[in-house]
Amino acid sequence: MADRTESSIVIDAPPGEVLDVIADFEAYPEWAGEVKDVSVLAEEGDGWADQVQFTLDAGAIKDTYVLDYEWDVVEDGTGVISWSLVSAQVLKAMNGSYTLASDGGGTKVTYRLAVDVKIPMIGLLKRKAEKVIVDTALKELKKCVEA
């Protein structure tokens, strides 16, 4: 599963504010249109979510799944938040990351995502679904943070 989708956007807010929105998983259904429900199942000792369950409806991909998160961020909010799939019904793999970098007074957010499903699906459709998820997530994140 070497293929992945990547896109970036600049958000008019410091990295710490962007990180706060990304880390507030239970608020995702309020701003991330394809996310219907979220539950934090476990937290790391430092308070970051470790395992999170999502219910997703992204058109071609509908599933309830659990992701395991790694937080490689510094105090100002810059760094990488990455995740990998723990369990799912439809998804076979969902690995991705947000990279937050200072960009003047704002934050450059790069979202990388690779998805694979258990049911047969043409690679082109998988990449299209990834692109829709990535582009929509970045636009919705920007809108939420800048509101």
Q: What is the predicted role of each segment?
A:
Residues 29-33, 37-44, 55-106, 114-116, ...:
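Hydrophobic-ligand binding "helix-grip"
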Residues 50-52:
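Short, well-structured hydrophobic secondary-structure segments
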